[in-house]
Amino acid sequence: MLILTRRVGETLMIGDSVTVTVLGVKGNQVRIGITAPKDVAVHREEIYQRIQRGDEPVASGAHHGDDSSN
């Protein structure tokens, strides 16, 4: 596992087309923004596990939705 340190507003690149930006830190929560091509699925781990089990349908464009869990 690669471990990186980033400050609020800083970004890291995954390959040539995915960016992950630290948007904010509050207590033990970190808000991140992810920019990825539409053909790259981005899910929180618990949602990904549900999809793998077949418990949750894969929504079209789900990685572009708003995660309003603050």
Curated annotation (Swiss-Prot):
A Gene Ontology biological process term: negative regulation of translational initiation
GO MF term (any one): mRNA 5'-UTR binding
Main location per the UniProt record: cytoplasm
Location of region: Disordered: 51-70
GO CC terms of this entry: cytosol
Entry annotated with the keyword Iron-sulfur: no
Keyword check for Cytoplasm: yes
Protein's cellular compartments: Cytoplasm
Sorted UniProt keywords: Activator, Cytoplasm, Repressor, RNA-binding, Translation regulation
SUPFAM superfamilies named among the record's database cross-references: CsrA-like
Function: A key translational regulator that binds mRNA to regulate translation initiation and/or mRNA stability. Mediates global changes in gene expression, shifting from rapid growth to stress survival by linking envelope stress, the stringent response and the catabolite repression systems. Usually binds in the 5'-UTR; binding at or near the Shine-Dalgarno sequence prevents ribosome-binding, repressing translation, binding elsewhere in the 5'-UTR can activate translation and/or stabilize the mRNA. Its function is antagonized by small RNA(s).
PANTHER family: CARBON STORAGE REGULATOR
Family of the protein in this entry: Belongs to the CsrA/RsmA family.
Binding partners and assembly: Homodimer; the beta-strands of each monomer intercalate to form a hydrophobic core, while the alpha-helices form wings that extend away from the core.
Protein name as it appears in the record: Translational regulator CsrA
Species: Xanthomonas oryzae pv. oryzae (strain KACC10331 / KXO85)
Source species taxonomy: Bacteria, Pseudomonadati, Pseudomonadota, Gammaproteobacteria, Lysobacterales
